Amino acid sequence: KTNSNYQQEFRQLGMQLMGRMDAEEWKEFYAKLVYWELELDNIEDSGMREIFEMQKKEANKLFCDFIEDNYLDWVNGTEDAPQMIHTLVKDKIAPFIGKEKTAVLVIDNLRFDQWKMIEPILSRYFTKEEEEIVFSILPTATHYARNAFFAGLLPSGIEKRFPTLWKNEDDE
């Protein structure tokens, strides 16, 4: 059943890859890829897995092209940016602070596919209010991304605003 369902979806995903996707469409596309990756992990058909890996490789290449074409416009504010990690606290968490109990669980380096694998375990203890794929900053290295998340600034902004506290990765 999984094989035939993926074969049908494979064609639709392939058509999407041939089109020009915006950030929201890329997020939806990635969520579908993660779904199928986890589904195909449960079957023994290595041929289907190979086909999926080829499609995923093509998607990664096209997504890299998309990021190259758009990232600077997003961080420079010249184009409407998707939700990014350095604006997440301001946009999604701060509005709830002081109004209701709020907890934020940050797991460094957690990809969406890894989240989907542990989500069933955590859902026994926590209620998920919202789920959204967000774009990281570049580079995605912990030193930069984690600081950007908590500061609400890009690394260059942190360095300008807090010059005595900021250290480049090479300085540590």
Task: Name each region found by the language model.
Residues K1-T102, N109-E172:
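…; additionally, a secondary subgroup of soluble metalloenzymes is captured
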